[in-house]
């Protein structure tokens, strides 16, 4: 007789999921516009802004495993309070900093930003401490919230518990990205500053909820030590099979990260300030939500490698759609062709993700040494660490070369001449995704042959 899934969850579970929604709204509201903020508000060039944003996201994938070890020692409640305090200070700092820069006479904010010395001033690097606070706070959130879901659910409701958790993640991400457009429309570039205040308000609300409502089972003293985690990292780096797999999947995520690295600046520069890159980005989770069940059902009798390979070959198609917009002239369904084809490309990216993401952890665990899968899975997101750094830096270089910042040119005509081949950016990502797809096929055949010889 099958046991019915339960809807009864402890209070800590509900509180954790609620504050996860607030945190995701804060993060994605800022992150979808982070390269715009760093360039239009703080004065960084495309390459500098991309490098900072890339390292920012990379560390948010790398540090949580270590933060989780500390959270296990001090307890989840203290960890969450520390996390939301750090996040509120970090987001608030990114909101307040422009006020100090403007009062120092380095810049004037409004619909359009007028730089009066900030670009050449070291004062712009004052944004880095605020971003470090967000990295530290976000690292605790990732480990503690998932830990709470795991520990506050039982066999009878765990599947439903994780379903609720991922729903909250997506609702938060969707709502955070949605707020960007009305702020930009109402305030122009100055709206990018108020996104930080929105994020600070969300995380401060999370802090209040944790302080007054969060009380979980005692978890302090549990979990792995920092030494055990470092040992696992060293062993992964020495495991040739896992490193090759991570590098191959890094290619996929390098392309996927362009939704945050390249897309906002590319669309606004080519389609105009009326474009809505933050709303276009929401097409990705929408497509994932609508198709992941169908794709999972279709691929249920196929191997993880087969499913991942299908997704890898969809990625170059998405990049080609993104490139095609700059070669079309007429509007499509009332949208600028660059914007319309970008939406189509993002939709294909989301579809590709449904073939890859659900099966990667399964395949990764199969490549791990027997009996040590759990320890190795703690670093299964190393591909996102690498792809954030390489993908964002590559974005900055390509934007500067093919679709430079219009404010660097005296006339719109001069900029248009420099950006004639802006769509070439996406051809590079077509190449990366194709190489990754072919490499995954070769990897699968080689690994299969090695396993057959050893059996």
Residue ranges and their predicted role:
Residues 27-36, 176, 240-281:
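Extracytoplasmic gate region of multi-pass secondary transporters
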Residues 44-58, 125, 160-163, 268-289, ...:
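Loop-to-transmembrane helix entry
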Residues 60, 159-184, 202-203, 380-395:
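Glycine-rich segments within core transmembrane alpha-helices of 12-TM secondary carriers
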Residues 63-76, 184, 290-310:
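Helix-to-loop junctions at the C-terminal end of transmembrane segments
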Residues 85-121, 313-334:
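C-terminal ends and interior cores of transmembrane alpha-helices
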Residues 140-154, 354-369:
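Intracellular juxtamembrane helix-capping segments at the cytosolic ends
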């Amino acid at each position: 007789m099958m046991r019915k899934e339960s809807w009864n969850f402890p209070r800590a579970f509900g509180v954790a999921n609620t504050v996860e929604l607030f945190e995701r709204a804060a993060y994605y509201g800022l992150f979808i516009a982070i390269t715009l903020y760093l360039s239009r508000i703080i004065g960084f060039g495309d390459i500098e802004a991309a490098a900072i944003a890339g390292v920012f996201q990379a560390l948010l994938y790398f540090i949580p495993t270590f933060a989780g070890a500390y959270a296990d020692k001090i307890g989840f409640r203290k960890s969450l309070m520390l996390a939301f305090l750090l996040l509120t200070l970090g987001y608030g700092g990114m909101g307040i900093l422009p006020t100090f820069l403007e009062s120092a006479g380095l810049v004037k904010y409004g619909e359009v930003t007028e730089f009066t010395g900030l670009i050449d001033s070291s004062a712009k690097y004052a944004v880095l401490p605020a971003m470090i606070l967000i990295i530290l706070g976000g690292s605790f959130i990732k480990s503690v919230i998932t830990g709470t879901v795991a520990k506050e659910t039982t066999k009878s409701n765990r599947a439903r518990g994780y379903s609720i958790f991922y729903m909250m993640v997506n609702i938060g991400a969707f709502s955070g990205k949605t707020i960007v457009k009305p702020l930009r429309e109402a305030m122009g570039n100055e709206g990018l500053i108020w996104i930080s205040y929105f994020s600070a308000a969300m995380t401060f609300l999370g802090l209040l909820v944790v302080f007054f409502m969060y009380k979980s089972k005692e978890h302090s003293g549990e979990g792995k030590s920092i030494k055990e985690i470092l040992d696992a990292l060293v062993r992964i780096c020495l495991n040739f099979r896992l490193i090759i797999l991570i590098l191959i999947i890094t290619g996929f995520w390098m392309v996927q990260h362009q939704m945050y690295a390249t897309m906002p600046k590319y669309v606004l520069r080519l389609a105009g300030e009326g474009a809505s890159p933050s709303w276009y980005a929401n097409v990705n989770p929408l497509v994932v939500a609508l198709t992941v069940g169908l794709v999972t059902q279709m691929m249920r009798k196929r191997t993880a490698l087969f499913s991942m390979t299908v997704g890898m070959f969809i990625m170059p198609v998405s990049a080609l759609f993104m490139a095609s917009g700059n070669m079309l002239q007429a509007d499509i369904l009332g949208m600028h062709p660059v914007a319309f084809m970008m939406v189509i490309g993002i939709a294909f990216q989301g579809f590709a993700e449904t073939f890859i993401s659900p099966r990667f952890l399964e395949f990764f665990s199969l490549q791990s040494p027997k009996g040590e899968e759990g320890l190795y899975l703690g670093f299964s997101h190393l591909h996102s660490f690498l792809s954030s750094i390489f993908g964002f830096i590559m974005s900055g270089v390509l934007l500067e070369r093919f679709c430079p910042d219009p404010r660097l040119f005296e006339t719109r005509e001069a900029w248009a001449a420099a950006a004639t081949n802006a769509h070439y950016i996406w051809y590079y990502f077509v190449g990366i995704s194709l190489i990754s797809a072919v490499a995954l096929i070769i990897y699968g055949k080689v690994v299969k042959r090695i396993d057959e010889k050893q059996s």
